[in-house]
UniProtKB/Swiss-Prot annotation:
SUPFAM superfamilies according to UniProt: (Trans)glycosidases, E set domains, Glycosyl hydrolase domain
The organism's place on the tree of life at top rank: Bacteria
Gene name per UniProt: glgB
Gene Ontology BP terms: glycogen biosynthetic process
Annotated protein name in UniProt: 1,4-alpha-glucan branching enzyme GlgB
Keyword Transferase (UniProt): yes
Amino acid sequence: MDPKAYSEAVAALVGARHSNPFAFLGPHEGRAEGGRGGFCIRCFRPKATAVSLISAADDTVLGRMKRLHPDGLFGIDLPEAPGALAYRLRVSEGDEDRDIEDPYRFGPVLGELDRHLLGEGTHLDIYRKMGAHPMTRDGVRGTGFALWAPNATRVSVIGDFNGWDGRLHPMRAHPGSGVWDIFLPGVVEGHLYKYELLGPDGSLLPAKADPYAFQAEKPPHTASVVRGLGTYAWNDGRWMSERADRVATSAPVSIYEVHLGSWRHGGGDRSLSYREMAEQLIPYVKEMGFTHIELLPVSEFPFDGSWGYQPIGLFAPTSRFGEPDDFRHFVDRCHQEGVGVILDWVAGHFPEDAHGLSWFDGTHLYEHSDPRQGRHMDWGTYIFNYGRNEVRNFLLANALFWLEQFHIDGLRVDAVASMLYLDYSRKAGEWVPNKFGGRENLEAIDFLRRMNELVYGRFPGAVTIAEESTAWPMVSRPVHLGGLGFGYKWNMGWMNDTLSYMSQDPIYRRFHQHDLSFGLLYAFTENFVLPLSHDEVVHGKRSILGRMPGDAWQQFANLRAYYGFMWTHPGKKLLFMGCEFAQGREWNHNASLDWHLLDIDWHKGVQALVRDLNGLYAGVPALHDRDTEGYGFSWIDCTDADQSVLAFLRFGETAEDVVMVVCNFTPNPRHGYRLGAPIAGRWREIFNTDSAHYGGSNMGNSVVETEETKSHGHAQSVVLTLPPLATIVLRPDGPITRIA
């Protein structure tokens, strides 16, 4: 190394701006002070008063290193090439001498193939390489770190193991790939760390959490935690082999949506841990008859008020409730008890917190640089740049990570509409058209299709669900047929229309009958989930119970009738926690659900109703076999708006497998109400939301016999009593004499 290059390297190193420290530190040809010939070892220890070279084989002192610069650069000349010399550094700092391994004698953490595949966007197991990974190299325990930051001019690992000093452990740059890596001996699981970066202009950026970290500090702290993938011993083999049947379009899928932090609190308003949730939530879900739990996002997030929808640590289950293996335990226990686990997954945007992904290397790395493409103005968040290979790879690998490492059964993808449309929530002039001049986000579409192909191709029995609020076609149709490839789509239109209807005073419902019937015009164009989610019980919308009109009796009766309509309507079911017992106030993420309400009979009655509706849904094939098929449904009458009555049939696999559903959405009982019946003989009432068991007036029908009076296109009919504000379900009972 010539004197000029040596001087420049020393200045860059002590100034904490050297972009390639491995070219200078550690063992090298040449003299320690830059002369030609021979071999040397250099190290940089700013706080050291002396450094000696120690043989790792026999602990003998090989020589005292010379101070090459007053700021802490030391070096020693060797008579021959270090070769495979295993050495340590004995560092004197103050009154303490300690032996440390030299990170700069170890080779790269990432291989050339890994870097190439990341650049292509095809390294689907990239989380096994990027981030922090405990490992042993040449018999030395430590952690390998790897980060993608192509525009940074220096990247260092900082942590509680080096005093958060960015001068100590600058990383190796891999030109052309944007990857930086280093192996740090002695850094083990549990250590805290971040990355310190200099931007393209050499300015110091806010310290960044690791995008690929498997654990983070418990908020409000923001450091990453060194944590390996682990060797958790799963006990859910039977579930994993059978789970495909549990989420099929012909299966009775009933999902309980849960926010872990507020479902139930322990002592002193403390949220339950993952392991406590396993002991309390799972038995409750089983007792209530739900088939799956859907968790609001568990990926680490800084702001409690985002409910997890503004994540930063996409590969780290939030530390609010425990460690990663604690979350694995929760999922494992769910599976052992026959309950599936679906995660809300956020791939549409990320927050602007300084320690997160925004402006990561001093440039718009994960987001678009143009705010017309890269900013959600409504939410104050950034939009992922799906057209950048490394960003797409990051997200695809993350989706697969949860399914592989945590045995998650499905991903409910949040805010899909915001991903699909370039003009989503934007005025004219505030968005950039695609290359064809349209408003479709072609890169996001390609990303979603690829994600779905990978999920279904790699993980049999897993499912993806889209929260998509527009009329985008074929969301839940296969990619090879031109669809987006999701398994299911939330039916936001059904939810909005039916809640609008139920909020009307019964006097005016006759003018809004179409709000209940319109959904059947498109009910089978997608594989739908009917969602009453967390979004419907916040921000002044009131609780579901609070939207029901009338006095207390009518509110509860309305709610019971509505749930009866929902559970018998085509589509899978989703209910947010607390709605199953008619919580009266809006959901508050900082407070536990109001479990004390179950001391009141009306609330206890709604809880019993939901439990029994789940049992009905699972036990009557006609209510789930053909949930997504048009020939599993037929109207008897959807036009009796004057009396606010709806009647329809649900069919299973055989003509005899049929149920009749009748809804009366007024507080007036209807006596002598005639409806056509497809099967002659006796019909038994098998469910009635007006049952006294649920808090109703106990008006009903028990068993009715068909009469040979034509009605509604059928050769026979039944005459029913319709309870007030109620849904009833009937099915053939006994010998069938005629089907017509």
